[in-house]
Amino acid sequence: MMIFSTAVLRLCATSRIGAVTKRASSTFLSSASSSSSSSSPTQSMPPQRYTHHQFQRHSYSTTTTTLQQQQQPSPPLSTAQLVKQLRLLTGAPMLECKKALASPDVNNDLALAQEWLRKHSSQKIGSKVAGREALEGLVGVCIDNCDGGSRGVLVKVASETDFASRSEVFTGLVQEIADAAAAAAGDGGDIVDIPTFLSNTQSITTGKLLSECLNDAVLSIRENIQLDSIVTIGTTPSSRSVIAGYVHGRAPNSTCGTSAALVEVEVLPKDGGGGDDAVLSEEEKSVAMEAAKKLAMHVVASNPLYLNPESVPVDVVEKEREILMEKMTDSNKPPEIIEKIISGQLRKFYEGICLTEQSHLVEEGNPKISKVMKGLGLVVKDFRLVGMSK
C-alpha cells in the first residue's frame, strides 16, 4: 500500500510540472507575437492556403509561364558571330565573310552568304590560281564490295603544297570524289571524261555536285586543286573475285595517302566444286583478301608495269629483244646459244616489270608470286597503282 501511494504522488507531481511548463511556453510565445506585431508597421498576413482546384490552376499557370519563357526565340547573332560561323562553314577569310554577309542580297543570311561566296569569290580565286603548278596531293581509295563482286577506284587529286594536301578540307574532298567515283564506275564502267564527271556527279555525303565541292575547297585552301585521274578495277565484277588495297604515306586522320594500290584476286573453283559462279565461303574470302592485301603492299614497293608476260605489248618485247641482240653481235657464239642467252635475259626482263614474275617482297623468303598464288588456289586478275610521283 505504501509503494502504491508513493507512485501516485510522483505521477501527480509530474503532471503539475508539465502543466506549468506548457503555460509558461504559451505565455512566452504570446508575448513574442505581440511584440513583433507591435514593432512591425504592417500586420503579417496569414499563410495562403489553396483548395485542391485552386492548387491545380496555380500549378498550370506556373508551368505555362515557364514553358513560354523557354520557348522565347533566342536573340539574333551579332555580326561578329555570323562572320565567325560563316568562316567555319566555308573556310573563307574574315573580310570576305563580312563582305558576303553585308551584301544587300544576303542581309546576314548564312545560307545566302554561302551562295554569294560560291558565285563571287570562288570564280575569282579559281581564275587566279588556275595557272599555278599543282604537284603535291593525295590518292583516295574506295572499294565497293557489292553482292555481285567487288569494284575499286583510285583517284588522284593534286594541290600546290603538301601542307594544303594534309588539311581536313582537302582529305575530305579526296574521299568524297573517290566514293562518288566508285558509285559511278558501278553504273557505267571506266570514267574517262573528268570535267563531265565533276559537273554531273553528286557527292554521296552532301548531295552537292562534285564541281561545287571542289570550288568550295579552292575557296577555303586558296590553292589550285585538280582532279588528275580516276582509275577503276573490277568494273565487271565476278562473284569469285575480291579486291583489296594498300595506302602508303597516309595523311593524318584519313584513308588517303601519297600512293595506293588495288589488287583483284580470283579464287579458283575446287575440284568438284560449284563452278565459276559459286559463292565464296567465308574462309575462301578471308584467304583471298589477305593475299590481295599483301600483293597491294608489294605493288606499292616494287612498282610493276604489267600483270604477267602475256600482258606486255609485243612492241615492248621486240624492242628489248633487239637491244639484247645488239649486245650479242660480237660474242662469236652459235645462234642457238645466243637464243638461249636472250631467252634467259628476257625472263629477267619480265621479272622486273611483271607482277606475277616478281619475288614477293612481303612473304617470308621472297618466293615467286605466281608460285604463292598457285599454292593458295588463287589467280591475280588485275592490279592498279597510282601515286603522286607515278
Swiss-Prot record:
Compartment(s) of residence: Mitochondrion
Family matches, as Pfam families: EF_TS (PF00889)
Gene Ontology BP annotations: mitochondrial translational elongation
Major site of localization recorded for this protein: mitochondrion
Chain spans, region Disordered: 30-54
Biased composition (Low complexity): 30-40
Domain of life: Eukaryota
CDD domains the UniProt entry points to: UBA_EF-Ts (cd14275)
Transit peptide: 1-24
GO molecular function: translation elongation factor activity
Keywords from the named record: Elongation factor, Mitochondrion, Protein biosynthesis, Transit peptide
Cellular component, GO, one term: mitochondrion
Function: Associates with the EF-Tu.GDP complex and induces the exchange of GDP to GTP. It remains bound to the aminoacyl-tRNA.EF-Tu.GTP complex up to the GTP hydrolysis stage on the ribosome.
Family per similarity comment: Belongs to the EF-Ts family.
Database matches in PANTHER family: ELONGATION FACTOR TS (PTHR11741), ELONGATION FACTOR TS, MITOCHONDRIAL (PTHR11741:SF0)
Protein's name in the database: Elongation factor Ts 2, mitochondrial
Source lineage: Eukaryota, Sar, Stramenopiles, Ochrophyta, Bacillariophyta
